[in-house]
Amino acid sequence: MLRSIGVPAADIARSWANVAVPGRMEDVSAGYPVRVLVDYAHTPDAVERALTAARGQGRLIAVIGAGGDRDRGKRPEMGALAARLADGVWITDDNPRSEDPAAIRAAVREGVMTVPGDLRAEVRETGDRARAIHEAISAAHPGDVVAILGKGHESGQDVAGVVTEFDDR
């Protein structure tokens, strides 16, 4: 449509470079010596794509969880992908809803443990999502990337039917 009204293709391409979708590979690095990305990746395919896209020159650290009252089968797969594609993984809560948060984290960790030790990222676990994010960023060095996956643009954490204000950004 823009081309039909005479806008040059180069101008259209430059404009698209500035388009950002909140919670989709959103760079929230301001104030940090490392690159910090927030992404809504909450399926195995999305986790794989986000971590592959986030890979930079330094280490890649992933903060990951899985939603409760959702597809339980994807949890181990997401854990395995994170353990294989990242250099460090923090397993944490991501809207456990009515499920036991520790059981969800255990399912993610189960997938992590399927990755052979020499190929597996260093893994840590904490149910406190804010703490996991803080620890992951603190463990990163200049040149590293921290990918915080699962919540993206969401502004709340649902635990046992109570939604508290929380934003990964």
Q: For the regions a protein language model found, what residue spans apply to each?
A:
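ATP-dependent carboxylate-amine ligase
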Residues: 1-169
